[in-house]
Amino acid sequence: MTERKQITIAQMETGQSGRVVNIGSGRGMKRVEAMGLRPGKRVTKISGMFGHGPITVKVGGTQLALGFGMAQKVMVEVAGK
């Protein structure tokens, strides 16, 4: 049986995929949901800058760039190792 764990998009490794389970509140988060990043959607981390730079994710056929603060507010369920 595969263990599932919840982490933020900021904590994901490049190329890792998961399912969005929660999106925190705050400035700009409603816009992120309107662009397709919402609970239940599958998301893949495409790239991220070392440190606190922007993070690119793929949701469906769309790529979104998230600021580091926004990426910390999106909880994703991923397969554990």
Predicted segments — roles?
Residues 1-81:
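Compact, glycine-rich, soluble single-domain proteins
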